[in-house]
A protein has these predicted regions:
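A C-terminal-region feature
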Residues: 1-49, 69-196
């Protein structure tokens, strides 16, 4: 994680302590702050033990190491998330509880091959998962294709894969350089595209 954090800080500056928020900027109307990247403070490890009990398994070793340092991460204006062990009262910048998200994501609905998968994050239409019965890899499941599209030995490898792409998609002010043109013409998109 240190290598990833150093890479982000080299482009946007240091993380500032709050819930560990990173490089805030005003939207054009100046009425709200936005955060490009957020690292959430770790929670008591007893919460991790409760999550293990809920899923009836250990967690992938690289996830355990991550959760000892952080209670989730939000990167690139929520484009990529690693869920937290528990939620908090932070409102918009909530780490998303891994247990609640697994109920919502329902990875098992995509086929029997995912029966032992636990979802721990996402990017776009892809869910990040580990297999409760085999810790060799962390998996990326494309929910549109309903299949595993990538596998990584560690969380650091998985995050590096996505950060390599996403870091160049945002300028030094945190503005997305290439927004989804399919949103053009939608009333809400016309208002918000200037902030993407």
């Amino acid at each position: 994680m240190n290598k990833l954090i150093n890479r982000l800080e080299s482009k946007w500056g240091s993380f500032e302590k709050d819930q560990h928020y990173f490089k805030q900027w005003d939207t054009s109307n100046g009425q709200r702050k936005s955060y490009l990247n957020v690292l959430f403070d770790p929670v008591d490890l007893s919460s991790l033990y409760l999550a293990k009990e809920y899923f009836k398994c250990e967690f992938h070793p690289s996830l355990l190491k991550f959760y000892e340092q952080y209670n989730g991460i939000m990167l690139f204006s929520e484009s990529l998330r690693i869920y937290g062990i528990e939620s908090n009262d932070a409102g918009l910048y909530d780490p998303y509880c891994i247990i609640a998200q697994n109920i919502d994501d329902n990875i098992q609905a995509y086929g029997e091959q995912f029966a032992n998968f636990v979802v721990f994050g996402y990017y776009s239409s892809c869910l990040f998962c580990f297999d409760k019965t085999n810790f060799d890899f962390l998996y990326v499941v494309d929910t549109e294709q309903e299949k595993v599209v990538y596998s990584f030995k560690s969380l650091a490898e998985l995050l590096a894969h996505y950060v390599d792409y996403l870091i160049d998609e945002y300028d030094v002010c945190g503005k997305k350089l290439h927004y989804d043109k399919s949103l053009e013409g939608l009333p809400i998109a016309n208002v918000s595209l200037e902030f993407i």
